[in-house]
């Protein structure tokens, strides 16, 4: 009985999360109906994502290069005392290291 209840709860949670994660978008305004704990919602890689500015900061990198330079992103994050979160197109995202 407990096993069945746990499976049911797991399926319920999984189905809710996949609906949120599967929301596609073309620009940031398509993500207005997504509920996030933060106010920053961005459309990246055609998916809506919630960004927490306390942990993630985006910096603009060389705009002539179509891809993010991973090593310069790592160096920048180290210089400000953070770790690399993701390097995507023209932006380097850093976050505070886990405790």
From Swiss-Prot:
Its main location: secreted. It is found in: Secreted. Residues 1-22 form the signal peptide. Disulfide bonds join 25-43, 31-48, 36-50, 68-87, 73-92, 77-94. One of its GO terms (biological process) is killing of cells of another organism. Keywords: Antimicrobial, Disulfide bond, Fungicide, Plant defense, Secreted, Signal. GO terms for cellular component: extracellular region. Belongs to the DEFL family. This is Defensin-like protein 306. It comes from Arabidopsis thaliana. The lineage of its organism: Eukaryota, Viridiplantae, Streptophyta, Embryophyta, Tracheophyta.
């Amino acid at each position: 009985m407990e096993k069945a209840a746990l499976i049911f709860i797991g399926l319920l949670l999984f189905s809710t999360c996949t609906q949120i994660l599967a929301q596609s978008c073309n620009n940031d305004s398509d993500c207005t109906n997504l509920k996030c704990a933060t106010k920053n919602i961005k459309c990246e890689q055609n998916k809506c994502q919630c960004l927490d500015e306390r942990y993630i900061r985006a910096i603009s990198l060389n705009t002539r290069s179509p891809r993010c330079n991973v090593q310069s992103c790592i160096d920048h994050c180290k210089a400000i005392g953070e770790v690399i979160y993701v390097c995507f197109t023209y932006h380097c995202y850093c976050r505070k290291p886990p405790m």
